[in-house]
Regions:
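Non-globular sequence segments
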Residues: 144-148, 152-174
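Conserved, mostly hydrophobic/aromatic
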Residues: 60, 85, 89, 149
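Short helix-terminating capping/connector loops at secondary-structure junctions
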Residues: 137-145
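Glycine-rich anion/phosphate-binding loops
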Residues: 66-87, 111-132, 141, 158-164
């Protein structure tokens, strides 16, 4: 049996061609024929999330920069990235960073770590993001800014001390 052939999305040059592909593929997705520029763009419109008004629908998703300090605090690169989140215009910062809750749960030795010692430095990340957002968009621009923090434990994928440590599959030798 041969695998089905799918057209490359880039080959669908018009809205009509894309719509015909969706119909042929029985994919019930509606879309606008023309993209609207802000402020008319649907992505530029506010949205309510759990009773909180978020200023637009642009979102920064959690990521691991692998650029924290060995102690788990933000580095200059981490702070720079968070300032850029602030000036991006996105109003939903959904995690910003994957932050380990325990040393042994860090995915790598440079992942941020939330402890009593690192908490003030991590709180300053948020402050820098809000400050850069205000500088770019005005002093009241953070009223509809929604910021969260993704707390993680990497489980069996944790590598808190070295970058490439082999794991023993079984403690019993064969």
């Amino acid at each position: 049996m041969t695998a089905p052939a799918y057209p490359r999305v880039a080959s669908l040059k018009t809205a009509a061609a894309f719509r015909a592909h969706l119909i042929r593929s029985a994919i019930p997705i509606d879309f606008d024929d023309e993209l609207a520029a802000p402020p008319r763009s649907p992505l530029a419109q506010p949205i309510e999330v759990d009773g909180v008004r978020v200023g637009n629908r642009f979102c920064i998703l959690p990521m691991e920069g692998w650029d924290g300090t060995p102690d788990g605090e933000p580095s200059d690169l981490t702070r720079r990235r968070w300032r850029h989140f602030g000036i991006s215009g996105a109003k939903l910062i959904w995690g910003g960073e994957a932050v380990a809750v325990r040393h042994d749960g860090r995915a790598n030795p440079n992942q941020l770590l939330l402890t009593a010692k690192t908490q003030p430095a991590i709180a300053r990340l948020r402050d820098e993001l809000v400050s850069s957002h205000r500088e770019r968009f005005g002093s009241n621009a953070d009223g509809d800014l929604y910021i969260g923090l993704q707390l993680t434990h990497s489980g069996r994928y944790a590598r808190p001390n070295v970058y490439n440590r082999p794991e023993c599959v079984s403690c019993r030798p064969m």
